[in-house]
Amino acid sequence: MTKESNDRDTVAREKRRARLLRGLDLKQSVGVEIGALCWPLVRRADAGKIIYVDHTDTPHLREKYREDPHVDANEIVEVNAVWGMNTLHEAIGGQYVDYVVASHVVEHVPDLVTWLRELAAVLKPTGEVRLAVPDRRFTFDYFRRESGLPEVLTSYVERARVPRPFCLFDHCLNAADISTAQAWRGRIDRASAKRHHTWQGALHLARDVVENGTYHDVHCWVFTPRSFANLIANLCDMDLIDFACEDFADTVRNGIEFSVVLRRSCDRQYIAESWRRMERAANDVTVGAPFSRARRKLKEMTVGSDEAAPVARVTGRKYDLDPIEPIALPPDFDPVDYLAANPDVLDAGVDPVLHYMHFGWHEGRPIHPPPAILTTERADVTGPK
């Protein structure tokens, strides 16, 4: 690689990073980045506190990617929290964070609903999730169909921990080597595209999942911006999640991804309209069709002039639209400790669980007293033996 091309890549990475993190006050925030590997969006030097989360620890990740030409194993970040069979909240020690960032991760998770709910469970009342998502139309998923509600719900009720057979079949039978530039010009020939797997290999992997529970890493879910908005809107309508779409950046020309900012809300109408707004904004003009470039530009101009769109919440600010309660109590919540840490709640005779759910979470109250006074305070709360 020449110095000039390397410089261009560096500039492109920094522009992408700035776009995905726009509005976040990294220095004053606590955040989580999932699956950073050697390309963290949030760097330790830039953040007040960043928690790197992955499915295993750093030594195992470096060993896993040692021979992968696309990953610099020596530059993989030091993982702070391992999210495996535990919940994300357990993995990060029961903390609440200002933001969660995940780049090209959401498409890999076997149970999309539970994954999103676990992200929601670690957010502060004003917290956000920033996702970068591959656009099927310009990647090796080109020939795959967009993921639908039935498959997502099936994985949810099954509590899937590994990619399900239908995901493996769709990937193995349809994933192919695709030129992004040609995809943007609409010049992909199905017959000549080189496939990643054979149907025999697909059957083998599916049987391995059913019989042995083996994890095979594939894109479980396939999206375009419009299909993503429609799917998440349906999940919100079913009260499975309560995320609104606060911001959306469509796939840029010759790019392969779109990005979405999600934030919890107590207003169901606001949530529903936010996803309808993203659906309307998403440019679904078929690439390669006659006058597609002109139609795409016209769509962009039409969306840009939509004066009826409500103003999204500003990152970090409190609004009446914000959620009323946390998804659940922190994993290490102890009523006695909470009363010891908050003597005014004890004096008021208020139920500690109800107080935390309705007030303590919003107020950022501690759930444990300082260690130096823990024993004494617990004795005061529980009374004589």
Task: Kindly give the residue locations of the regions a language model identified.
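Short alpha-helical segments and helix-capping/turn motifs at coil-helix boundaries
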Residues: 14-21, 34-38, 114-115, 246
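Aromatic-acidic/polar surface patches that form glycan- and anion
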Residues: 24, 104-108, 217-224, 251, ...
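Conserved SAM-binding loop
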Residues: 29-144, 260-264
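Residues that flank catalytic or metal-binding motifs in active/ligand-binding sites
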Residues: 46, 255-258, 352
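S-adenosyl-L-methionine-dependent methyltransferase catalytic module, highlighting the catalytic core
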Residues: 71-76, 80-83, 114, 124, ...
